[in-house]
């Protein structure tokens, strides 16, 4: 699917080669990252918006597609967010996109300069439309070095933007922000890698706090499904069949890039005790949103048991319990009948070598 780019601009944040960070003038942020006020950064501002060319639209389409595939968190603006105040002036047409982008670039540079990991980057701001929804995309992209061969077959060094691998980006659903100011999901951001807090400064730049938690929502959904089956007095086999229906629906939504719609999900599974699942979930107050971003790792537990520890990793389909796999709680054992062929082959070869 294509996107429609309305406005786009690039600015640069440059860390001069001579910039030094004194080791004795650092302090710890709340997130445990080293911060400093002495990182020297320069902001190079483009003097006009980029023309909306085929190249600009392709550039933004690739960024959009890459962002869609990222693991994202959800956020909301803080009351005193300077970025949100500037954005509001833009949306109220009190300022234009270019001066808004200047404010944002300077604000980002000021926030980034506090950190020891500050590096150069290209700051991208783009307002675009996708599936009848207006978005503001914001990212800080790294440049990579490479080589190219010209028409004379001469080799030259070049720089290119790394638009497939980036960690510092956010997107604001302007349509949602306009029609539902109390939404807890109009802002999305890339969740940083485990153990890294580099992306946190970007949230500080935006003046945003985390909003909707997809992991918690998925866990609450699983609990609601389990309770629904229990209240319906289903057998273990019947419960597992319902859970598989839920998993198949959720898997389909993931593959389509869509969210879990609670009402739609409710229509795909049996009605128990004359009460649809959606009504049951609302009545029991699980705190579920009408639309839930699916988390694949959490949803797997609908159809699988898995665990690891002390050098052992086990994963099997839930429907095999009490059929081929038996659990003895008192003895703390699992008995497996019918080992996987490749595992059995490895064990037989080991036994043969020992003999």
From Swiss-Prot:
Superkingdom of the source species: Bacteria
Intracellular or extracellular location(s): Cytoplasm, Nucleoid
Keywords on record: Cytoplasm
Example of a GO MF term: double-stranded DNA binding
One of the record's GO cellular component terms: bacterial nucleoid
Keyword Cytoplasm: yes
Protein name: Nucleoid-associated protein MS1911
Organism of derivation: Mannheimia succiniciproducens (strain KCTC 0769BP / MBEL55E)
